[in-house]
């Protein structure tokens, strides 16, 4: 099953919000909870499956940056019912990244029930 990644809202105090961005009204629901923050990159949100990959939109048009991503995804043995989501930084957007370890940065992995796996699995805690 192919699943569209939902939009991530900006924090209310973000300085880079555009007219089509969603933003949180408040951050009060984070008070007293452990949170993990990551840097927002200027790329293309992409999902990798064992036999398929797509941008955030399930029907996104073909682009050379997706060819690179497909080549990357076939190098790994992704479990049948899982998907790996991350930012595809291969194509140049408003920011041109250099000196990256990879043009694909993973930010979440989802199981067959569409549950996001705990980051504790990936980070030494």
Language-model region placement:
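Active-site-proximal "nucleotidyltransferase
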Residues: 1-44, 50-77
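Non-transmembrane, aqueous-exposed alpha-helical and coiled segments at domain scale
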Residues: 31, 69-102, 109-111
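Short His-Asn-centered micro-motif
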Residues: 38-39, 55-56, 85-89, 107-108
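Short hydrophobic/aromatic residue motifs in ordered secondary structure
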Residues: 45-46, 111
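Generic hydrophobic alpha-helical membrane-span motif
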Residues: 48-49, 114
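Short, surface-exposed beta-strand/loop "edge" segments at domain boundaries and coil↔beta transitions
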Residues: 59-64, 94-95, 114-117
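Extended, acidic-biased charged interface segments
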Residues: 100-125
